[in-house]
Amino acid sequence: MNYEREIKKRVHNEKWCVTNEQYEYANQIKMVNDISNGSETDITKIAIQEINKKIAGYKHQDKLKKLFDENNFLTFDSVINKMIECELKCRYCLREMNVLYDISREMSQWSVDRVDNNLGHNIGNFHLACLDCNLKRRRRTDEKFLFTKQLNIIKQDTQDTQDIKDI
């Protein structure tokens, strides 16, 4: 039996005229900055549409879980500002994230990660994280997960330690 997941392309991407180059990180950052500056191009229009679609999904989630707070729910501008602030890098693993992606369930896609999962996707209650970290964090606290993701264990060479003792 083959347990490897089949890589599925996103169907609606076929309608886009997006080059492989436009999926690259540097171009995704430029695209976010262009959106922030009000530049309208074919690629920014697609990105705006995709961001709004994802925000609508978070709104739907909050309504289902009875967490929706109309006065505090995140906005398009709050998401764009957060993308610029974090330079489109995951809060936890610092991976470069994608706004546009062509593979379903792309683990490097941006996602909204709630600081307090008992609250909705509200301004002041979210960071941006890659989908991989967002799914792995589950119900752990934001700070504990951040600590485990950015923890660097330094292993000393025991031979160097022995040489120092001999001196």
For the regions a language model picked out, list residue spans one by one.
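Mixed-charge, low-complexity interaction segments
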Residues: 1-61, 78
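Structured catalytic/translocation cores of nucleotide/phosphate-coupled proteins
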Residues: 1-19, 66-67, 121, 153, ...
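Short, charged surface segments at domain edges that flank catalytic/cofactor-binding sites
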Residues: 45-92, 118
